[in-house]
Amino acid sequence: MSLKPYFSLLYSSPTNVKLSNFLIAQQPSGDLKTTPAEEFSPLVEKFNRRLLLGVGSSSVLAIGANFGGTTSFILGLSPGIGRNLKLDVIYPIGGYSRCIDTVEGFEFIYPATWVGDQTLLYRAAEKSERENSLDLPPARNSRRKNVNEPVVAFGPPGSTGELNVSVIVSPVSPSFSIEAFGGPKEVGEAIVRTVTGSGQRADLKGTLLESSIRQDSERNLKYYELEFKVESPLFRRHNVAVCCAHSGRLYTLNAQAPESAWSEVKSEIYTTAKSFNIIS
């Protein structure tokens, strides 16, 4: 059985993000003796209770706009509660924002300074305009959506796209199972072979570094977490991918970085990958 129908490296964006995936508060100056976090720490327990109570009565709206990063700072005092309430969709918490796609059914957090891929945003706007249009759809030449194209992608503003995270959702048979390809190591090695063209390109080398399974026993879901690097004379890239099959869909989150920047961004990449969950 071949993985090629399910994993590929076909996407390339001409604007903010160029991907190579498989389907796969300012502090004032002065003599301050305590930091803002130390001053606020006695209020954390009280804040936790009030935040939980406030949600039930809608008083959480009193937090208001994120002026000067104040809201994000306060929520950062208790990041677990804020994230459980999905407040990081609106306000960054602990340096991360949340992406929730209720249509495709997944979520993850990503560095709050990153922005969405403009090509995908424009395409989504065009799709919405077409769906809301009163005009009849064209009878011919309707372009089929590329199933290997990410539904979301984020990266640092103004970057070349070498550092990014994206999610691809592909339709598969309801009976499709990643487990059929073997354990995490076998799956990882097969994906690396697919990414590198199964050895057909002598100048492209892939190495599987880590492979594991994160299991959601409550929902009977298995997330295959893979770390690998791809090297060629033109680039050296470090990837962390998460794959999960559910209800006739194959979900693949791929986070990548230049090998030269890996030591600086690996904590953010790992955090993003570990946060990926299916919510459908």
UniProtKB/Swiss-Prot annotation:
It is found in: Plastid, Chloroplast. Residues 1-36 form a transit peptide. One of its GO terms (cellular component) is photosystem II oxygen evolving complex. It comes from the Eukaryota. GO terms for biological process: photosynthesis. This is PsbP domain-containing protein 7, chloroplastic. Keywords: Chloroplast, Plastid, Transit peptide. It comes from Arabidopsis thaliana. PANTHER family: PSBP DOMAIN-CONTAINING PROTEIN 7, CHLOROPLASTIC, PTHR31407. The gene is PPD7. Belongs to the PsbP family. One of its GO terms (molecular function) is calcium ion binding. Pfam families: PsbP (PF01789). InterPro entries: Mog1/PsbP_a/b/a-sand, PsbP_C. The keyword Plastid applies. The keyword Transit peptide applies.
